[in-house]
């Protein structure tokens, strides 16, 4: 905990920027929810908070279990923490989804701390929101199975496009500076698992793009399978 507090002090300006972006995403979600989301589930405020907190806690625990992928360098690892968050957004709307995403990352920081000066944690939040927001907004606009599938497909596309660009433009250069290595060294790590990776753009194409597609597909599929079943348990749906 002391290391986390010290890291927060050293990166105060960055954390304030992250907070501003988080607030902006919550406001954006609230606007979309007000304009587009009809027939949302009514739930007492206390129960809503408890429900979001419960799913965020599950997501934070899932975030601790990371799976390396054969086609990507070792610093890209899959976790399934977006599943509870996407479920939360489908049950309660985009605002609850973004808040759940934020609480998930905060809980993970309390459980495990940060090894990336909060950069990786911020990236997880922002990239996760690019899946959660489009999927939940489109679903709540119509609340049908078809729109749920379309929303998750749109969210996967948005996450893949944004995540790939974000890695190329910001994350990879930032990590190179942070760890005192060159971008060429990062590319070389990718080349060890895939000889087709010879540049940053090819690293993104052959590692980041399939990583995000796979994560989006798995998250969407599990959410689709669990949504009604858990809904009956939590909301006594028939």
Model-identified regions with their sequence ranges:
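Loop-helix junctions at membrane interfaces
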Residues: 1-238
């Amino acid at each position: 905990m002391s290391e986390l507090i010290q890291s927060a002090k050293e990166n105060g300006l960055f954390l304030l920027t992250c907070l501003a972006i988080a607030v902006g995403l919550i406001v954006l979600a609230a606007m979309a929810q007000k304009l587009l989301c009809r027939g949302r589930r009514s739930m007492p405020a206390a129960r809503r908070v408890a429900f979001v907190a419960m799913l965020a806690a599950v997501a934070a625990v899932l975030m601790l279990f990371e799976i390396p992928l054969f086609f990507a360098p070792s610093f890209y690892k899959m976790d399934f923490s977006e599943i509870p968050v996407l479920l939360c957004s489908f049950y309660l709307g985009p605002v609850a989804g973004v808040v759940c995403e934020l609480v998930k990352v905060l809980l993970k920081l309390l459980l495990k701390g940060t090894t990336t000066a909060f950069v990786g944690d911020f990236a997880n939040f922002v990239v996760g929101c690019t899946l959660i927001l489009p999927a939940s907004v489109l679903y709540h606009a119509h609340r049908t199975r078809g729109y749920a599938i379309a929303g998750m497909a749109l969210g996967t596309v948005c996450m893949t496009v944004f995540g790939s660009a974000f890695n190329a433009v910001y994350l990879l250069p930032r990590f190179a500076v942070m760890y005192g290595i060159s971008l060429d060294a990062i590319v070389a790590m990718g080349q060890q698992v895939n000889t087709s990776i010879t540049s940053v753009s090819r690293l993104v194409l052959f590692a980041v793009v399939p990583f995000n597609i796979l994560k989006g597909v798995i998250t969407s599929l599990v959410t689709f399978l669990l949504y009604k079943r858990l809904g009956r348990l939590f909301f006594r749906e028939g």
